[in-house]
């Protein structure tokens, strides 16, 4: 009986140990599965996060490149406008300087009025500051034309240059520094654009 009890105790121990080992193996197996699931979920989350980060980085790069391109375009347009403005101002200054020479201006007026039909009534409008000196030169050079209906008048709206008006029609021909410079600039502008074209 003593052996039976001992065998029974050993059997209970053995069964308990086997059950404990089986339970322990089940727990370990379950823990491994859970760990594998956690790792798989973590890897999936990391993959999704990496893909999202790469997309955001790529989007940021694309936006940054587009912003850079726009900034470069704006800079080029700004430089072109500034160069165009400098060119236009230099052109106006040069035309004004040329038209400041009263002898040249008088010759120009004479050549232009010579091409008009005889007997046409013309009014030559000169800027006020140059009127007296130009009037003397023109009276000497035009002589009889002034008696035949050509008239010289001071005009406030002209800085340099002159305007010619046909009396009967009311038509004006503008030879002021501003108008000549504008016409030259419009003529030269396409060529100027080709010279400064960067892109």
Swiss-Prot record:
Function field: Produces ATP from ADP in the presence of a proton gradient across the membrane.
Key words, A-Z: ATP synthesis, Hydrogen ion transport, Ion transport, Transport
Gene encoding the protein: atpE
Cellular component annotations (GO), alphabetically ordered: proton-transporting two-sector ATPase complex, catalytic domain
Keyword Chloroplast: no
GO BP term (any one): proton motive force-driven plasma membrane ATP synthesis
GO molecular function, one term: proton-transporting ATP synthase activity, rotational mechanism
Protein name: V-type ATP synthase subunit E
HAMAP family found in the cross-reference section: ATP_synth_E_arch
Cross-referenced InterPro entries: ATPase_V1_Esu
Superkingdom: Bacteria
UniProt similarity note: Belongs to the V-ATPase E subunit family.
């Amino acid at each position: 009986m003593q052996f039976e009890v001992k065998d029974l105790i050993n059997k209970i121990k053995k069964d308990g140990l086997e059950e404990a080992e089986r339970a322990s193996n089940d727990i370990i197996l379950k823990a491994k599965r859970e760990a594998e699931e956690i790792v798989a979920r973590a890897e999936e989350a990391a993959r999704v996060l990496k893909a999202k980060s790469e997309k955001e980085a790529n989007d940021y790069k694309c936006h940054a490149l587009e912003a850079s391109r726009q900034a470069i375009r704006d800079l080029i347009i700004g430089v072109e406008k500034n160069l165009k403005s400098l060119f236009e101002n230099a052109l106006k200054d040069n035309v004004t300087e040329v038209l400041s020479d009263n002898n040249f201006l008088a010759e120009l007026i004479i050549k232009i009025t010579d091409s008009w039909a005889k007997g046409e009534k013309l009014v030559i409008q000169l800027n006020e500051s140059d009127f007296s000196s130009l009037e003397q030169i023109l009276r000497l050079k035009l002589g009889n034309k002034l008696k035949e209906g050509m008239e010289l008048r001071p005009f406030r709206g002209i800085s340099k240059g002159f305007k010619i008006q046909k009396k009967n029609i009311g038509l004006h021909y503008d030879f002021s520094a501003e108008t000549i410079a504008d016409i030259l600039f419009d003529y030269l502008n396409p060529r100027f654009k080709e010279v400064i074209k960067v892109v």
